[in-house]
Amino acid sequence: MGAAGYGALGVAFALVSYLLVTVDLGLDPFAVQRVARDPAGLPSLLPQVVKLRLAASLGAYALLGVLTSILPSQVVGGKELALIYGGRLFSAALKANWALRGRDEMGQVAAGMLLQNLLYAAGIFALVRCPEPSAIRVPILFMAGEAVLVLWYLGRLKAAYPRLWGAPAQNGIAATLLRDSLPVAASKTLRLGFHEGDLLLLAWLSTAAQAGFFLVGHRIVTALASVALLFQQSAFPSLSRLSEDRVGRSLDFQRSVSRGILLCFMPPIVTGAVLGDPLVRLLFGEEFAPAGAILSISLAAVPLLALSAGLHNCLLARGRPRAVLAATGAGTLVHLLLGLAWIPDSGGLGAARALVCGEAVVLVLSSLLVWKRWRVLAVDAATLWILAASGLMAAILWQSEGIWLGWRLLLGLGAYLAAVLFSGALRPHELRRLLEG
């Protein structure tokens, strides 16, 4: 397919992702919170959420049809690709991962995602070995994985609730959730500007090939960020219950979660940032070599995103969705302005720089809002030590260029672990102590 074909797939996917917010409606945090506090009420809640989202998905798909008819092909990435990816609007309405999260069954959520990705990867593996691989088959394979994921989630819930769809509805639940969730839906729409928005800007202000380079460079970033956010999401039900008690305790819990995420994720982030160019050449081939620099820059956004997501969990659990909207909106505005300034000249590199700057603004403002409301620092000394240890690892990897790669990685990782252990930032029993308390 080449960089241009890869970029067309990414642009079509990005367009559908924007419409996906009109189906999601920002309901997940509040639905998760309700299930975490009252698991027995799930059979009454699930049908209302699904019906509301299915109605929204019909309108969103109709809008997608209009957009693919009136917008230039480089903006939509191809009408057929966008319309097939549009099936996500319906699978999103049926996905019940939020119900499993509320029941603290993150293992089932992760297992479903793993199954989906394995099936998708197997399909792509078979596709690239076809004599003439067609781009149109990629969204078809993706939607097959989505269907499996929907059935997996509903099957897990059906096993726990035999009368999942037969419970009497409680009037007003969906309306109450929808009213509370609108700021979250707006925040999610703005948040899409940090990846999907970049792809659309690149397709508009640059070329499909540049969008393809950005998508390849951002593929590893997205994988790491998705797992980090999955850990943050798994903590939200417990955080919701803790938030009914003392505020300080819930904030301590969230800082511990964020610190654990950084502790595990900083070594691969640093390694990818330093070795981005050879890593992209190895995984995607010489044709996508320009994506190496994009990967190196974009990886800096992962720890920023992980920390800000933790702060947003605290704000949402305490009923402050408008604070999340304010921080996300400001970061998105900075990101958009920088993207408009840098993308025409620098392409994917400009988009990557704008992405990191926007994420930094979101984190700073979120930290200030948490401090203003509760007078609690969002980042503690142990977290700063982890970041400092990451800087030491990066310096060793850079300075040891020329020796065998295995020794470079061992030296860098050894220095990182030594610095973390020396600082006392490694606290393996802290999360368990907080949960038991």
Q: For each of these PLM feature ranges, what is it?
A:
Residues 1-28, 61, 65, 120-121, ...:
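Signature of the first transmembrane helix
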Residues 3, 102-103, 130-132, 205-208, ...:
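Helix-loop interface residues and adjacent transmembrane-helix termini in multi-pass membrane transporters
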Residues 18, 66-100, 140, 148, ...:
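Alpha-helical transmembrane segments of multi-pass membrane proteins
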Residues 115-116, 120, 138-158, 170-241, ...:
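Transmembrane helical elements of multi-pass membrane transporters/channels
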Residues 395-437:
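Membrane-proximal transmembrane or re-entrant/amphipathic helices at the cytosolic face
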Residues 1-11, 37-48, 59-90, 130-139, ...:
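Membrane-interface helix-capping segments at transmembrane helix termini in multi-pass transporters
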Residues 35-49, 213-329:
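Specific pore-lining/lateral-gate transmembrane helices of multi-pass inner-membrane transport
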Residues 79, 83-86, 110-161, 218-221, ...:
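Hydrophobic alpha-helical transmembrane segments
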